């Protein structure tokens, strides 16, 4: 369980840095799309990070998978979210699809590298 807590915390910490660096852009983008200020549903966010932790641990880390495989899993996971938004929201920017999809791969790869530096 300690391993999963490390993964969970690492995902949140790295994502906080990413979201913080994009916050001004994201606030405007979400405001333009939903016509109200960005407000995070923390239960939804918690469940999202639990799901991301499960995916990364079950499919990659528990099997000592390659960092490239972690990158591809993150890329695919974030691509599903981004392309769904791109398909369903009129003003979802292609820039966000590209940047956030790449970030998913980077997030999973960095988290895996940190995990392996401690546990392998």
Indicate where each model-derived feature is located:
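Juxtamembrane/disordered regions of integral membrane proteins
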Residues: 1-120
